[in-house]
Amino acid sequence: MRFAQLIAMAAAWLAPCTALGADSTPASASDDRIALSANGSTLPGTNGGGGASVAWLHNFDADTLAGVAVEHQVISVAHWTFGSVNGSLTRELGDARYSFYGEAHEGAGDNGAHAFKYSIVAAGLIGTYFHRLSVQLEDRQFDVITTHGNLPKLGLSYLWNPHTLTTVSYADTVGGNLGTHLTSGRIDLSGSQLNFLAGVSFGQVSPTVLNLNISLPGKTLKEGYVGVTKLLPHLRGALTLVVDYQDLSGSNRVAVTVNYIFHFGHQGKPT
């Protein structure tokens, strides 16, 4: 799932304002976490799919994060495995905060007809102003099977209060054959023990962007998802459940993802 990437998993667990670089500091300057994820999905005309991942996330200090992961996914007759590295660096400039981030996912798989290479890399910048407004610029490059191209994205987020964050974004293909023009919206609600999220996406999209590495007849997407995170202070972790519904030109997919993130080795505390 697109929102279950490593940095997104951490962001779903931490308070939304922290994830966007607002005026907040992690409880521990140096911290280590393990992120475990499993998912299952349905897809008409197939036996569905599923997958799992394990990741290590490390905060070198309050503003520097890095992580590595390995993931395996199956959908219909296709399967693929890849490793990931990611990192982010945040710096203050006057009253603004800027977070630079990058990620790379490299691996291989087989779709039943032939073996294929799996490569997705991305880099981006998030600027936060007035402790409330964030602007995101990102470019994501795809090279999977015969699909390739760049997908720049512009996103705007606004922190209405310490517990409510809204985000809208637009991504459009540049070069290659992605053929993607995607509009998205999301809301995050955070509480003392529970965090909630919900979002929608619609537009033209390549199945590869949805992590569907099989041939599908249509490219018109209507998507909605909801999720909840339960903070587990006594276990120094958090559990997230996300349910995602996708309608890709009449081909309906339902996916359920469970993430568990926990601290180890240091005395950091969940936000």
State each model region's role:
Residues M1-D31, F264-T271:
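Cleavable N-terminal export/targeting peptides
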Residues G21-S76:
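Short glycine/proline- and aromatic-enriched beta-strand/turn motifs that initiate or cap beta-hairpins
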Residues D32-I34, F60-V68, E92-G102, F130-L137, ...:
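Repeated loop/turn-to-beta-strand initiation elements of outer-membrane beta-barrel proteins
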Residues A35-S37, A55, N86-T90, G124-I126, ...:
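Outer-membrane beta-barrel architecture
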Residues L36-G40, V68-H72, G102-E106, A123, ...:
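Transmembrane beta-barrel strands of outer-membrane/channel proteins
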Residues S41-G50, Q73-G83, E106-S119, Q141-N150, ...:
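Solvent-exposed loop/turn segments connecting transmembrane beta-strands
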Residues L182-D244:
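Outer membrane beta-barrel transmembrane domains
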Residues I187-L194, V226, N252-T271:
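Outer-membrane beta-barrel "beta-signal"
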